[in-house]
C-alpha cells in the first residue's frame, strides 16, 4: 500500500463549503482508498491528510469529488522507519 500526504487548500480560505459537503456527503472516498488521519490549521484554511491506496487513480477520483471547494497537492510519502532503512547504506 502506498501512502500519500494530501495538502488540501480550502478554496478562498473558506472552510464552510468543505465542512458542509463533508457533513452532507461524507468523505466521498471510493472503495480501496483509505483515510488514515488529518490535521487542520488553526486558521481553518488548510488540511494535511494522509491517505492510503494501492491504486493512485482512486486518489484522483476522490480529488474530483471535491472539485470546486478544495485545491490539492499530493505527495507520495513513506514512514520514517522505511526512510531510515532507505538512507542507511549511504550513511
Give the predicted meaning of each segment.
Residues 66:
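Short, conserved SAM-binding/catalytic segment
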Residues 69-80:
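Conserved short beta-strand edge segments in small beta-sheet-based binding/regulatory domains
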